[in-house]
Amino acid sequence: MKPCKVAIIGSGNIGTDLMIKILRHGKHVEMGAMVGIDPTSEGLARATRLGVPVTAAGIDGLLAMPEFGEIRIAFDATSAGAHARHNATLQAHNVRVIDLTPAAIGPYVVPSVNAGEHLDAPNLNMVTCGGQATIPIVAAVASVTPVHYAEIVASIASKSAGPGTRDNIDEFTETTSRAIESVGGARRGKAIIVLNPAEPPLIMRDTVCCLIDEADTAAIEAAVHAMVERMQGYVPGYRLKQRVQFDRIDTPVNVPGLGPTTGLKVTVFLEVEGAAHYLPAYAGNLDIMTSAALACAERVAQALGNHHALSAAS
């Protein structure tokens, strides 16, 4: 099957790292264009050196490129505010969109949990870095027993948080909280992000807490380990920091949206080290987003290729 041509909109850290991942590891996708708005950006310069067609004229520049007619999938690595226009423009040209912003126009996708559920959707949202790291764990627990409440804390190196991340803090917490419920399966979800200013920068660390009824702790631990292994298939630096912890709550505690609650608290500590393709190893928060986006695009490209093959056969 011929690889699917893709464009990346946004030549910053995430867009550049994603480009390098596609160039090195793309199986069903290949670079067709890199789009930015700053002619002097390092991302566009690097793309040019690597032989990728570029434009510094944004989405309008992409439409004017001779290569645009071959583009089947576009990644948006800009901002939630800009994404609405980008999406509308691309949809008008029948281009599938993979959204790396918190705009959440399309369904949430976490490849290890629901990659196969929305392959026909015109727009797929990759949630957030914190969501990509923690929602699989919530889903693992929920596969064993109902999760009444899940709370995640994503701690990332301040140095790895660019202007887009900082401008989208509110969208980050809102989008991640909703996806904890809709993808992770928790009845209620809450997300917190911490920008850690420590020097030297620390790698991404995540804490996942789930409140459940009494359940088979061995089955939960096995489900968590299986999910970690699945995650490592596309994010090799994803790992469990220590054993899954279980604490019984006999005295009722007030849970947002649920009221006084007792039960079993499951706590999982994670760390995510980046592959250092372009970004430093401590920027696991960015690496997990680009890795998840590539994994998602591979599935979409396969589906597009299969559909094209079936149409040709008929």
UniProtKB/Swiss-Prot annotation:
Domain of life: Bacteria
Catalyzed reactions: acetaldehyde + NAD(+) + CoA = acetyl-CoA + NADH + H(+)
High-level lineage: Bacteria, Pseudomonadati, Pseudomonadota, Betaproteobacteria, Burkholderiales
Entries under CDD domains matching the protein: ALDH_C (cd23933)
Binding-site residues, NAD(+): 11-14, 160-168, 285
NCBIfam families recorded: ac_ald_DH_ac, PRK08300.1
Alphabetical keyword list: Aromatic hydrocarbons catabolism, NAD, Oxidoreductase, Plasmid
Protein's UniProt name: Acetaldehyde dehydrogenase 2
HAMAP family, per the entry: Ac_ald_DH_ac
GO biological process, one term: catabolic process
Alphabetical list of InterPro entries matching this protein: Acetaldehyde_dehydrogenase, Acetylaldehyde_DH_C, NAD(P)-bd_dom_sf, Semialdehyde_DH_NAD-bd
Presence of keyword Translocase: no
Pfam families noted in UniProt: AcetDehyd-dimer (PF09290), Semialdhyde_dh (PF01118)
Family under the similarity heading: Belongs to the acetaldehyde dehydrogenase family.
Active site location: 129
